[in-house]
């Protein structure tokens, strides 16, 4: 190989290396943020926040959708996304305790009340002894559902159980109801199961089959519920400017109006 050819080859190799370095994922776009949300009505609400963030703050929001409550925190912890907006504080606290996540709330969003739904009965007076009642199986929403059942007199829980009771804390069950724990996304479908008389469903999943607490719920969680949903970041990015911009965009009148529309009046402002 001639000296001249060697020089040309070396220069070409250097240019190629520089090109690869320049195009590599070494830095995130300065005005870009990835936000995890649950598919369905919450996604529709987040899409309005996405628009507000762009128009008011010049922030490009990429929405990443999930079908369950477990993966959004895992993705956030790994750095696959920058924020998520889907969970209430008791759930976040339990996830941090169980999985050691270094996650933190950076703002409130909405309270989405849970409610009791049925395709078999029209009132609780029709609920027969021994009926099966479907509940979400994750610890915080299970506890939330048991507290709701207690509030309407279907069960009684031990004193002092706090926000995380389990079925083992049921001390009175006058109708001998069979409490069946299911994955939250399965609860809407459980209404078609002939064995299930009643299901306690989060508004996020109920809305996916056209149900709303005010119109379709046999009984509904009180609006003073402590289960306000949160916008969550990692401890290492909680103070980032893009995070603050997204929170401001989400806590806007436009997003509140969108939430009320998406949930047919079932969203309560949490800020």
From Swiss-Prot:
Membrane topology, from the record: Lipid-anchor
Top-level division of the source organism's lineage: Bacteria
Lipid group attachment sites (S-diacylglycerol cysteine): 23
UniProt key word Lipoprotein: yes
Signal peptide positions on this chain: 1-22
A GO cellular component annotation in the UniProt record: plasma membrane
Record's keyword annotation contains Membrane: yes
GO biological process: D-methionine transmembrane transport; methionine import across plasma membrane
Any one Pfam family match given in the protein's UniProt record, by short name: Lipoprotein_9
Disulfide bond positions: none
Subcellular location: Cell membrane
UniProt keyword annotations, A-Z: Amino-acid transport, Cell membrane, Lipoprotein, Membrane, Palmitate, Signal, Transport
CDD domains associated with the record: PBP2_lipoprotein_IlpA_like
Any coiled-coil regions, as ranges: none
Lipidation (N-palmitoyl cysteine): 23
Family: Belongs to the NlpA lipoprotein family.
The protein's role, per its UniProt record: This protein is a component of a D-methionine permease, a binding protein-dependent, ATP-driven transport system.
Additional record remark: The MetNIQ system is also to be able to transport the toxic methionine analog alpha-methyl-methionine.
NCBIfam families: MetQ/NlpA family lipoprotein, PRK11063.1
Name of the protein in its database record: D-methionine-binding lipoprotein MetQ
Source organism (scientific name): Yersinia pestis
């Amino acid at each position: 190989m001639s000296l001249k050819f060697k020089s040309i080859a070396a220069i070409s190799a250097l240019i190629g290396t520089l090109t690869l370095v320049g195009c590599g994922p070494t830095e995130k776009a300065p005005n870009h943020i990835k936000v995890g949300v649950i598919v369905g009505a919450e996604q529709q609400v987040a899409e309005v926040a996405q628009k507000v963030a762009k128009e008011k703050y010049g922030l490009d929001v990429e929405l990443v959708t999930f079908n369950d409550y477990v993966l959004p925190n895992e993705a956030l912890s790994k750095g696959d996304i920058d924020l998520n907006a889907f969970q209430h504080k008791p759930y976040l606290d339990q996830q941090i305790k169980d999985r050691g996540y270094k996650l933190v709330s950076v703002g409130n969003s909405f309270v989405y009340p849970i409610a009791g739904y049925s395709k078999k009965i029209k009132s609780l007076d029709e609920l027969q002894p021994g009926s099966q009642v479907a509940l979400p199986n994750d610890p915080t929403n299970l506890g939330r559902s048991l507290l709701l059942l207690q509030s309407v007199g279907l069960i009684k829980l031990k004193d002092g159980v706090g926000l995380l009771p389990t079925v083992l804390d049921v001390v009175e069950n006058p109708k001998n109801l069979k409490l069946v724990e299911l994955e939250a996304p399965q609860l809407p479908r459980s209404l078609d199961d002939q064995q299930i008389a009643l299901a306690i469903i989060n508004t996020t999943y109920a809305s996916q089959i056209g149900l709303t607490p005010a119109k379709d719920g046999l009984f509904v969680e009180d609006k003073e519920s402590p289960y306000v949903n949160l916008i969550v970041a990692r401890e290492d990015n909680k103070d980032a400017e893009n995070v603050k911009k997204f929170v401001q965009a989400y806590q806007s009148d436009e997003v509140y109006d969108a939430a009320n529309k998406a949930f047919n009046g079932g969203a309560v402002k949490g800020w």
